[in-house]
């Protein structure tokens, strides 16, 4: 896209409005990174939004009195592209998008922001707002990425081991342990783009009775406390107890046999 008749005053206006517009369209559920290397007439932005929350995407904040046409071009990962447009002079709205979750945040004559009311994995893709003005065309491109918090489970294994699993997260979660152990971590990718991470750890030290599993993810971190199954230590103790009981019983039997033997010997002598 090309800008026509660009002036220093217009350049300053665009810089200021990018900042204000970006702050209006950002909430605690989405993270924005701007690509400052893009031309002034087009800003490329990466937006990360947690699944199930609302996403709000902005155009250039140009006064509608200067706009002729505002068009949102939506290209989702696995669906055909569609458009939502607003003709300023006739106040006409046209759309080819079938997803009712994707709408104008307000009325386009008031604000051209696009809203996704409940983000799903199917909403990942590119969202481009093109604003046509007499001074030129201005665009803002969003690469929308959906974050999925993993479901975290854990359980103690056998012989001083523990297992921690972060299921179906996007992106993949990171798992660490305190204290450090001898760990094996595996990951499994799913067809919907989520990843399951599983970490199994073993601790040799007998003085380690409990450990913590720390799951780190873009949507938040979790720390889990796990008591270790003592395993072989418990078995050894049980064996020693059984051996001790057997030795005591053997001693009692020998004592009875010895007593009976000496009693019989005394009877024979008399």
UniProtKB/Swiss-Prot annotation:
PANTHER family: CELL SURFACE GLYCOPROTEIN CD200 RECEPTOR 2 (PTHR21462:SF2), CELL SURFACE GLYCOPROTEIN OX2 RECEPTOR PRECURSOR (PTHR21462). Disulfide bonds join 59-129, 164-213. Keywords: Disulfide bond, Glycoprotein, Immunoglobulin domain, Membrane, Receptor, Repeat, Signal, Transmembrane, Transmembrane helix. InterPro entries: CD200R, CD80_C2-set, Ig-like_dom, Ig-like_dom_sf, Ig-like_fold, Ig_sub, Ig_V-set. Residues 39-145 form the Ig-like V-type domain. Residues 1-25 form the signal peptide. Belongs to the CD200R family. It is a single-pass type I membrane protein. The chain crosses the membrane at residues 242-262. Residues 263-270 are cytoplasmic. This is Cell surface glycoprotein CD200 receptor 5. Glycans are attached at residues 44, 192, 221. Residues 134-229 form the Ig-like C2-type domain. CDD domains: IgV_CD200R-like. GO terms for biological process: regulation of neuroinflammatory response. May not be a receptor for the CD200/OX2 cell surface glycoprotein. Residues 26-241 are extracellular.
